[in-house]
Amino acid sequence: MGCVKLVFFMLYVFLFQLVSSSSLPHLCPEDQALALLQFKNMFTVNPNAFHYCPDITGREIQSYPRTLSWNKSTSCCSWDGVHCDETTGQVIALDLRCSQLQGKFHSNSSLFQLSNLKRLDLSNNNFIGSLISPKFGEFSDLTHLDLSDSSFTGVIPSEISHLSKLHVLLIGDQYGLSIVPHNFEPLLKNLTQLRELNLYEVNLSSTVPSNFSSHLTTLQLSGTGLRGLLPERVFHLSDLEFLDLSYNSQLMVRFPTTKWNSSASLMKLYVHSVNIADRIPESFSHLTSLHELDMGYTNLSGPIPKPLWNLTNIESLDLRYNHLEGPIPQLPIFEKLKKLSLFRNDNLDGGLEFLSFNTQLERLDLSSNSLTGPIPSNISGLQNLECLYLSSNHLNGSIPSWIFSLPSLVELDLSNNTFSGKIQEFKSKTLSAVTLKQNKLKGRIPNSLLNQKNLQLLLLSHNNISGHISSAICNLKTLILLDLGSNNLEGTIPQCVVERNEYLSHLDLSKNRLSGTINTTFSVGNILRVISLHGNKLTGKVPRSMINCKYLTLLDLGNNMLNDTFPNWLGYLFQLKILSLRSNKLHGPIKSSGNTNLFMGLQILDLSSNGFSGNLPERILGNLQTMKEIDESTGFPEYISDPYDIYYNYLTTISTKGQDYDSVRILDSNMIINLSKNRFEGHIPSIIGDLVGLRTLNLSHNVLEGHIPASFQNLSVLESLDLSSNKISGEIPQQLASLTFLEVLNLSHNHLVGCIPKGKQFDSFGNTSYQGNDGLRGFPLSKLCGGEDQVTTPAELDQEEEEEDSPMISWQGVLVGYGCGLVIGLSVIYIMWSTQYPAWFSRMDLKLEHIITTKMKKHKKRY
């Protein structure tokens, strides 16, 4: 009996210890709980603190505020993201990635009181440009440290090198981190246990050291400013699985010609935008584990390297932005190949026969090359294809039915080719982008396109598509870009096309045969940025509901039959940069309120070819704040920015330098005012001279009068000035000769007088710039100004001038001659009367008087 009691007692003690030990993880030390709560209170929780949160595979996950669950009533070991030692209860790991934290991370943070930490992940938060504290180097037991993408800035402290137990160090960020160049090599020297090192976008600005940990499996140094020749030892790290050296334009990479020590382990190799020294060696054939290879923008030239075709386990091969040439060889049987990009190699040519038998291919990009011929119609091995890009080649023929039958197709881009025939019905229900613009396609828009639940881009412009726009288009509730411009569509615009779509950003129905009114209601909260309806037969008024388009940057309603007064309320669209109402039936004076902010962001204002009357809208012209600044940027031309310009270029008619042309992209510096072909009257406001960024000014074919404002001399970058066919009087301001960028000048058919300015650009303008101004003189006209040399042609001499002995007869000479002639004449009279010949004398006297009088009149005109 005693033995039984003893057994039960021992069992009780054992169970008590077991329960006690299992409860230890919940016994968080009070000082550590307090430190965590103090750390929590240093930050706010902002759901927008970080938008992109990747998981370990790179896929986006949802961020959530882990610290909101922290409170005193529970043990810190149960808090979200906190992990404790099962024996001691000490906090040994803190996972706060993607926790929506926002605020300054102070160097004396209570976090540094958690001295037993082994793992610390603060990635994907927003610490608003905080410095990385040297105290991170005091976590002597730390094996994992992730501070990436949390908006840290400044120099990474050298104390990080004290963390000799680190296996994982991730500090990559685009916010402005750097390592002092001479600290990079010592940092690596002490971190001998590293398995993963990620310093992407950290400014290293140094050569690549060779003392990387021999245990490295991941080395990510993209965008770090590395330069010089990459040490070959990097390729011989025997455990290396992932090597990313991309976006180091001063880095030279020479691949080993013999078998690499990492050949069996290397799975990912990214060398995008580095310099590859030689051709791809045969040693690439030994990379039997390689799954992903990115060699875009590496100046590869010649035929596609054969060793790349031997990578039998490759899943993703990216050779875009190179100078590869010749036909694409027949693809081997890549059983695992899912992604292939040869985008923008320019000189890759030949047909597409190589496409067969790649059953796993999901994404194929052959855009921007010189491929020719039709797409083969007998391809049957691409049933897994999700994305197909063949744009900007020389492909022709009809689009084969197998493309429309792809069951999982998500994105299709066949634009900028010469495909013909009809667009067939799509089998896929998962389409998100269909781009078939700039081909020769005809027929109607297939119903299957209008019933997609995820379609975001539908770009069918510049084809020969006909018929009506079905109201079924309103089912596309996820649509962002809709471009049906430059087709033969007719009928009315469905009223619901905007009303039901809260995501629509670009609406382009220009250059069709659409009629009726714009009866769409633009609801409050819409995000439309571009509305282009020009070149149709639309009537009625400009919808007042457009005032709800707060993000609108371009509004082009030109070349229609709209009958309305000027929609002054459009001035409240403060994002508006381009406004074209040209060639309509708009009329009446342009009235404006006293609000000085109206139209302040406009860069292009085109109201030409309407029936506007009254004075020029001086107050609106004075509000054009953007035009009051000169774009002094240099280098590559910058265009009016648009977040979707990679997919879509708006087409709008621009009048500049005396010509109308359709522009698909508009320079950010291109500032234009075109008020021509209206009935404006009165004087030209001198306030236009304040618009110093103006490049083109056209006020022609109105009823303007008065003088050309001298303030125009301030328009120092003006390239085109057209004031023709008005009633402008006075002289051309001499100060206009200082406009050194002026290429086109038209002042014809006015009432200008005086001398034409001389010098610089004015010496290059011809007669047509000034014709129809009878009072103008000077070059290039035949009427010259005083002091200018005159060139007289024989055709300009009349009969009297030919009889002159000298073209320069002075008044003194005439008087002397007349006096002498008088004395002689009196003597002759005496003789004639004496000899009885009065008739002869009378005839001679009359002739002499006529000759002298004529010469005197001619010289009086000349002087």
Swiss-Prot record:
The UniProt keywords, alphabetically, are: Cell membrane, Glycoprotein, Leucine-rich repeat, Membrane, Plant defense, Receptor, Repeat, Signal, Transmembrane, Transmembrane helix
One GO CC term, this protein: plasma membrane
Q: Which residues form the signal peptide?
A: 1-21
- Going by the UniProt annotation, this protein carries glycans at 71, 108, 190, 203, 211, 261, 299, 310, 378, 396, 416, 464, 519, 563, 674, 698, 714, 746, 767
UniProt keyword annotation of Transmembrane present: yes
**Could you tell me which residues the LRR repeats occupy?**
91-114, 115-138, 140-163, 164-190, 191-213, 214-237, 240-262, 264-286, 287-311, 312-336, 337-357, 358-382, 383-406, 408-428, 429-452, 454-476, 477-500, 502-524, 525-549, 551-572, 573-597, 599-623, 667-690, 691-714, 715-739, 741-759
Q: Where is this region: N-cap?
A: 24-90
Q: Does the record carry Acetylation as a key word?
A: no
Provide Cytoplasmic-side residue ranges.
834-863
Spans annotated as C-cap/acidic domain:
760-812
Q: Where are the transmembrane segments?
A: 813-833
The membrane topology noted for this protein in its Swiss-Prot or TrEMBL record is: Single-pass type I membrane protein
Q: Which residues lie on this side of the membrane: Extracellular?
A: 22-812
Q: Where in the cell does this protein reside?
A: Cell membrane
GO BP annotations listed: defense response to fungus
Q: Which domain of life is it from?
A: Eukaryota
Known function = Involved in plant defense. Confers resistance to the fungal pathogen C.fulvum through recognition of the AVR9 elicitor protein.
Q: Which family does it belong to?
A: Belongs to the RLP family.
What is the UniProt domain comment for this protein?
Answer: The extracellular leucine-rich repeats are required for the specificity of the elicitor protein recognition.
Recorded protein name is Receptor-like protein 9DC1
Native organism = Solanum pimpinellifolium
